[in-house]
Regions:
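Intrinsically disordered, charged low-complexity linkers and terminal tails
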Residues: 1-194
Length: 194
């Protein structure tokens, strides 16, 4: 079986976030099947670490592609992380809060629906303290419970855990951000018609 890498994806995959996420999932499935071909005795500690890393990455991609959302918060957090995370997958809360506030301010400036009326970002528009509390309670907590993100109080940063972040190339960052854009577009279309 020939190895599939992100460089072997079709150009169409890079133009269609849904298609690219399917390709990424297929990559994960191929890695799973090649690993299963090894007997338990043949698996090394490196294989086991790799399995855990690949499995966490696959779960992250699955979560991104099938994000359940009551509000727009999760895709915005992922977009902020894709934009501001450093080489270690960490982004400051200040940058993340700025991203949220700028996102909602831009929607307001364009005369678009900002969020549901009960949203913190509507009720406390522009309030950094309320934004911080909401980000840490809702979208972040969901990813933390799944072992995908951590929050470091000392540095005031959210981190995408290394087993996931180490598998995210710049191309994948762009694809994930594009996919979040598509999810936000669908979310707001639905919100504006209800």
């Amino acid at each position: 079986m020939s190895e599939i890498t992100i460089d072997s994806f079709s150009q169409e995959a890079f133009e269609d976030p849904l298609l690219l996420l399917e390709e990424l999932k297929r990559m994960g499935q191929l890695a799973d099947s090649s690993r299963e071909a090894k007997s338990v005795e043949q698996q090394t500690e490196e294989d086991i670490v790799s399995t855990n890393s690949e499995e966490q990455y696959k779960q992250f991609i699955d979560e991104v592609s099938d994000m359940k959302k009551s509000f727009s918060y999760k895709p915005i957090l992922i977009k902020a992380m894709m934009e501001y995370a450093d080489v270690n997958g960490r982004a400051s809360m200040s940058d993340i809060i700025d991203y949220y506030l700028n996102y909602f301010q831009t929607r307001a400036d364009q005369g678009k629906v900002v969020e549901k009326a009960e949203s913190t970002f509507v009720q406390h528009f522009g309030d950094r303290k309320a934004a911080r509390r909401t980000i840490l309670i809702y979208p972040y907590k969901r990813f933390e419970m799944k072992g995908m993100m951590k929050f470091d109080k000392a540095s005031d940063q959210i981190e995408i855990v290394p087993p996931i972040w180490d598998n995210i190339s710049n191309k994948i960052r762009r694809v994930v951000a594009s996919y979040c854009d598509a999810q936000l577009l669908r979310y707001y279309e639905k919100l504006e018609t209800t």
